[in-house]
């Protein structure tokens, strides 16, 4: 077995180990509004549910040479953002939004996706996404590396409104139909995955 002390690894090697082993990761497709009114959109796979009561989602946004990305800056300034489930039908468009553009440019111009008005926040959602969560910023936490450089912004959002396409939601039972949702997930590097074979385990009492 290989053993590595974390303080002896480069940032790149640490990223490769974590992103290659903590898999598959759900992909949050996040929209925010810039100060000039541009709809910024970007995908993040350092993402998960924090709590269902209250309904909280976490998104970690890595910085580039200490500089905040548009998503983190906009979310902190406005206190709002919208998280979308990345599915197979739109994952290629979502990948296009990972391009580095100016803050006043909308990544949506690189895609066939369309903004749609939200119900509880000022930030638009994405019409083509089959699940979206309108969020208010609950907490913003920054993290520094061993050199004292701020390298990540953790956004914790409280979901204030859920949007579910009729095809992915069983309204009678209150269940999400994963076979219809077809979520896409992130692996290491440029690799992604579809939902694989499901199996059932009974939780012990």
From Swiss-Prot:
Cited InterPro entries: Flavin_Rdtase-like_dom (IPR002563), Split_barrel_FMN-bd (IPR012349)
Protein's organism: Bacillus subtilis (strain 168)
Protein name: Uncharacterized protein YwrF
Gene3D superfamilies reported in the protein's UniProt record: Electron Transport, Fmn-binding Protein, Chain A
UniProt GO MF annotations: FMN binding; oxidoreductase activity, acting on the CH-NH group of donors, NAD or NADP as acceptor
Alphabetical UniProt keywords: Flavoprotein, FMN
Essential cofactor(s): FMN
UniProt family annotation: Belongs to the flavoredoxin family.
